[in-house]
Amino acid sequence: MKQMTEQNEFILSKQIIRSGTSIGANVEEASAAQSKKDFISKMAIASKEARETHYWLRLLRDSRLCKKLEHAELIKESEEIIKILTAIVKTSQKQN
């Protein structure tokens, strides 16, 4: 049972790191976009990655593999990141 728990922790943490770091990478790429369309595309991908990260954080919470206080703040922050990125995409699309 312990080995299974450790394996689940590894899988969840790997997914959170992958999708979480992808947010920043896509925002960075967007800042060097060659066109408005490219900028919107990269920011939209960052928004999708933020939603995926939010999913993995909720899954981590529901699995009870970490303390409640640890994931509550991360989930709240991920919601804020989603709101920010969504607003950037929508505003950029209106201006395009």
Regions found by a protein language model. Name each.
Residues 1-29, 33-96:
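Short, C-terminally biased terminal segments at protein or domain edges
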